[in-house]
Amino acid sequence: MRLTFVSLILLLTTCARPCQAFERPDREFRVFQFPKHMIPCIDGDPLDWDIVPDSYRIGLDQLEETANHAARDPNNLNISVKMGWVKGLNRLYVLYEAYDDYWEFDIPGLDGDIFELVVDGDCSGGPLIPELRTDLKLDDRNGFLFRGVHAQNYHIFTPAADKEWCMVWGCQPWIAGLPWANAACSYTFRHGESGRLTLEFWITPFDYAPFEGPGRAAVSRLEENAIIGLSFAVLDHDGPPDHHRFGFWSLSHTTTMYGNASELVKFRLMPLENRFRKQVEADWTFRVVDMDRRLVAFIDRSHGPNTSWRWEFGDGTVSTERNPVHTYEKPGSYVVVLTVGGHAGSARMVKVWDVTVK
């Protein structure tokens, strides 16, 4: 089989990343892809999420209470979670809606109702807190610097009231603020009352999130159809007499998912649904293979049952290959046009001066 240069590029850029073992291996949850013009506004209003089908919703029926082995009772606690993403943005969007018969949020520390989320963007697995490591013993400082580096844990206060919206259980609290995260919450109840809460937020998963800050960090690359490791738990406090006793409702059906990325579950980053797409869409990208030779590889990313491709490179030459490699004779900035077509119609994409060679 002849492997062209462009085929090699496509292979290297689309090959699946290796993933560790997951909890509930027979179950795969889905992350809805929002169209780029319908990104949710983080304002505590779930209206933007109406386009997400109910099949994406994760309810209380998918969670197990692992601390006390309590039975599900929607009159005590009931939840709904939807996950979203936008192609081209390395963000995870979350809508959390909950009913609780007793909302606890008047204590300054962690003794209150919490939505706890753990994400492992590159499926590296393994402990993310030193207490769960068995391979070596870390001293206090090394343990602190290890915490949350390759997978992140967010303790999200529901509601936060006068606290920061979440506590990052790690050495990198900077990941909870802009431009890495944002959140909004709406509710009308008071502490100790029953009622409904709506929480909207987005976070940025990191393959490497160090104590020093974002300068050395590595953001996880979110790609269509990729699997990420993720799980969440609802910590449900019910007030006196024991503020320290709470229910731990886990999507992984384990308790230590809070600190072990190998106990997360699979979430697939879904493609854009056809209802948001045209039958035929032209799109493409390129890579400069050799600037000295002005050698450029063009890569088709069009959508639809296309059977023809016409590339106009802006220098008077044309190609009908799907993924051509072109050499420019002269330096300059070029207007490149791709026209695709088939039985469903045609479309074209023009990029002005993106392709520049010297």
Q: For each of these PLM feature ranges, what is it?
A:
Residues L12-Q20:
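C-terminal segment of classical bacterial N-terminal signal peptides
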Residues N274-K358:
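Extracellular/lumenal mature domains of secreted and surface-exposed proteins
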